[in-house]
C-alpha cells in the first residue's frame, strides 16, 4: 500500500479526520503558517538582535580558538596589539602605482624574522687570525659613488667642452636649479626616513639617463638603513642588470661593510636589502660577492653575514657556477673558502669545467708554506663529499697527494676516506657476467 501523503498546508491533526472534513478542508483556502523573510535591503524590518548570553558564548569560543592558535604557533606570550582606527575618504585605492612597505622597529623586525636572522655574529678568534694571514696587506683604496661620479663628470665635462667648442662653442649644459632643489629635498627626506611613502621624484631616478649623477645629489652615505632598503628594492626592480650591478657595488656594498665594521653586526634593513638585491642574481654576484672577494680585505664576520644570504635564498645554477669559477681562479683569501663551501652545499649539478677549476684551485696549495685555515680544509671536504663521483682518476690521485702535503689531524682522514671510496668518472662500469 502506498505511503499516505498529507495535503499541502494540512496540519498533523487532520491526518485521521473523516473523509468529508478532509474534502471540505481541501477546498477551503487557508493562510500559510510559514513566514517569508525579506532581504535586509528593503529596510522595512528591524535588524536581528543578538542577546547578551549568545554574545558571551561567541566571544568565549573566539577567545579559546585564539589561545589555541597562539599556543600552536608559539606566540602566546605576546599580547595582541589593538589595531588603530583610521578614517579614509573614498575607496581604499593607493594614491600611486606602487605601495611601499612600512617597516617596524628593529626589535620587532628581528623578532618577526625568527631564528634565521642573527643580530650578533659569533666569530672564532683562531679562524679570524688564520684568515687575516691571507688578507691583502696593502689593499687598494675603496672607491665610493662620489669618487666615481666626480671622475665621470670631470671626464664627461672635458670631453663635451672639447667637442662643443670645436663644433659651435655652446656652453656645457648643467642641471636645472629646480632639479637640484627637488633632489636636495629628497636628500633631507631619505636622511630621516623610517617608514611610509617615498617621494615620487626618487622613484623615477632609475628611468633617468643620468641616474648616477642624480643619485649623487641625494648623498647615499647619509641615507637611513630603511631608506637604503627601499632604494635597493626600487633599483633592483627597475634597473637593468649592468646598472643594478653599479648600484650594488658603489652604494650598497660600501654601506654594508661600513655598518659591519662599526657595529660588529648588520642592521636588519641592510640585511634585507642584501636579500632583495638577489632579485638580479647576476648583478648581485658581480656587484657584491666578487668585489668582496677581490678586495682581499673581507673579514670573517662579513663573510658569515653575506654567506647567510647564499644559504637562505634560491640562486640559479648558471650564476652560481660562474661565481664559483671566478672565485676559484682569483687570488686566495680566507673568505673565498666560506663562499665556495656554501655554494657547494647547495648541491648543484656543476659543469665539469667548474669542477676542474675547483680541483686546480686546491692543488695550487701544494707548495704553500703558511698554515692553511680550517675553513680551507672544510671547503675541500665539502667538495669531495658532494662531487667525489664526478672527479677523474688523476684528480683523485692528485688530491690524495695534496692531503699528504697539507694535512689536518681531524679532517684529512675523512677526506681521504671519501676519496678512496669514490669511483672516478672516467672508470667504466664492468658488466657482471653470469656463469
From Swiss-Prot:
Q: Does the keyword Transport apply?
A: no
User: A single GO molecular function, which one?
Assistant: snoRNA binding
Q: Where is it mostly found? A: cytoplasm
* Annotated positions of the Phosphothreonine modification: 154
Q: Cellular component GO terms, alphabetically? A: apical part of cell; chromosome; cytoplasm; nucleolus; nucleoplasm; preribosome, small subunit precursor
* Role according to the record: Required for processing of 20S pre-rRNA precursor and biogenesis of 40S ribosomal subunits.
Q: Which family does it belong to?
A: Belongs to the bystin family.
Name under which the protein is recorded: Bystin
Species in which this protein is naturally found = Bos taurus (Bovine)
Amino acid at each position: 500500500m502506498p505511503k499516505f501523503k498529507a495535503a499541502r498546508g494540512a496540519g498533523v491533526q487532520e491526518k485521521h479526520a473523516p473523509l468529508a472534513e478532509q474534502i471540505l478542508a481541501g477546498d477551503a483556502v487557508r493562510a500559510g503558517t510559514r513566514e517569508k523573510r525579506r532581504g535586509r535591503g528593503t529596510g522595512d524590518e528591524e535588524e536581528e538582535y543578538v542577546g547578551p548570553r549568545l554574545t558571551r558564548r561567541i566571544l568565549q569560543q573566539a577567545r579559546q580558538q585564539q589561545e589555541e592558535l597562539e599556543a600552536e604557533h608559539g606566540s602566546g606570550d605576546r599580547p595582541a596589539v589593538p589595531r588603530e582606527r583610521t578614517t579614509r575618504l573614498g575607496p581604499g585605492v593607493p594614491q600611486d602605482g606602487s605601495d611601499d612597505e612600512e617597516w617596524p622597529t628593529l626589535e620587532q623586525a628581528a623578532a618577526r624574522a625568527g631564528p634565521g636572522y642573527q643580530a650578533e655574529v659569533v666569530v672564532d678568534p683562531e679562524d679570524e687570525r688564520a684568515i687575516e694571514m691571507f688578507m691583502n696587506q696593502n689593499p687598494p683604496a675603496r672607491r665610493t659613488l662620489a669618487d666615481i661620479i666626480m671622475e665621470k663628470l670631470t671626464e664627461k665635462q672635458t670631453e663635451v667642452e672639447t667637442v662643443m667648442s670645436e663644433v659651435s662653442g655652446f656652453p656645457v649644459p648643467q642641471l636645472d636649479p629646480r632639479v637640484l632643489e627637488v633632489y636636495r629635498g629628497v636628500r633631507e627626506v631619505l636622511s630621516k626616513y623610517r617608514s611610509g611613502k617615498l617621494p615620487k621624484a626618487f622613484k623615477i631616478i632609475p628611468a633617468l639617463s643620468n641616474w648616477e649623477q642624480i643619485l649623487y645629489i641625494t648623498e647615499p652615505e647619509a641615507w637611513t638603513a630603511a631608506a637604503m632598503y627601499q632604494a635597493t628594492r626600487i633599483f633592483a626592480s627597475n634597473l637593468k642588470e649592468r646598472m643594478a650591478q653599479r648600484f650594488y657595488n658603489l652604494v650598497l656594498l660600501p654601506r654594508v661593510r661600513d655598518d659591519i665594521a662599526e657595529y660588529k653586526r648588520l642592521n636588519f634593513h641592510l640585511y634585507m636589502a642584501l636579500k632583495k638585491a638577489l632579485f638580479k642574481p647576476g648583478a648581485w654576484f658581480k656587484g657584491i660577492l666578487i668585489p668582496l672577494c677581490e678586495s682581499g680585505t673581507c673579514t670573517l664576520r662579513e663573510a658569515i653575514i653575506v654567506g647567510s644570504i647564499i644559504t637562505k635564498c634560491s640562486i640559479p645554477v648558471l650564476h652560481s657556477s660562474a661565481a664559483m669559477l671566478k672565485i676559484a681562479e682569483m687570488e686566495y683569501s680566507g673568505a673565498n673558502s666560506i663562499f665556495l663551501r656554501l655554494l657547494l652545499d647547495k648541491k648543484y649539478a656543476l659543469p665539469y669545467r667548474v669542477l676542474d677549476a675547483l680541483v686546480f684551485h686546491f692543488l695550487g696549495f701544494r707548495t704553500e708554506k703558511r698554515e692553511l685555515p680550517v675553513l680551507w680544509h672544510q671547503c675541500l671536504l665539502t667538495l669531495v663529499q658532494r662531487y667525489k663521483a664526478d672527479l677523474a682518476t688523476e684528480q683523485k690521485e692528485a688530491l690524495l697527494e695534496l692531503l699528504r702535503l697539507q694535512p689536518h689531524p681531524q679532517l684529512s682522514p675523512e677526506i681521504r676516506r671519501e676519496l678512496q671510496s669514490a669511483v672516478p668518472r672516467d672508470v667504466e662500469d664492468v658488466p657482471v657476467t653470469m656463469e
